[in-house]
């Protein structure tokens, strides 16, 4: 987990997808969902698989959660669809992945790869292969997506007044590439993605600042929960009205 050395009296955590960049729809609809359909054999119910995944990742209270819990939740919703049952399609929810999620706080490919090496579990191997392919697809697809209007100006205003952290469930490599592509990585003390731990863990850095001097900017209930768990103020970004 990243440990900040405070340089200013204030700390601002910034979620990336959906807050700094308009990338949520692009990543999920063009990168995550096609790979979920392919890797989990959902071709016969692709319409409903897409609906379930879009609901979980974009349009529900689960918006913005880590990819692995989102995968499990999407499959669980899909299991319940009568249209899926009517087609005789059996949806399996990977129990080994659920167990790993329950036991691990740094839900990323490195820790999953370590568990695969330790156990050789087929469900974990499948989830790792899916996640690696998602990363590959994101790297090939996501480009030329500028920050939201006035994001740069907002960062300029915070510079010299507050320490800033990217606080995201996206892999570090993708975050670093996206922030560097547009020259805004210079504004933040660190980029803390899924390999750094959960958003709640990253925001434990708030304890180093005076009360009411810490803020999380997020677009999902999970961001709010991470903020309140660390006594941070919260600024909500309303999806669709960024």
Regions from the PLM with identified roles:
Residues 40-57, 82-90, 185-189:
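Short, surface-exposed acidic
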Residues 8-10, 162, 211-213:
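Short coil/turn segments at beta-strand junctions that form active-site/ligand-binding loops
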Residues 58-141:
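A metal-dependent, Asp-based hydrolase signature
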Residues 113-116, 121, 136-165, 201:
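Short, acidic loop-to-helix structural element flanking the phosphoryl-transfer center
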Residues 2-53, 69:
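Active-site neighborhood of HAD-like aspartate-dependent phosphohydrolases
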Residues 211-242:
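Acidic, Mg2+-coordinating phosphoryl-transfer loop and its flanking beta/alpha structural elements
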Residues 165-215, 229:
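Substrate-recognition "cap/lid" segment bordering the active-site pocket of phosphatases
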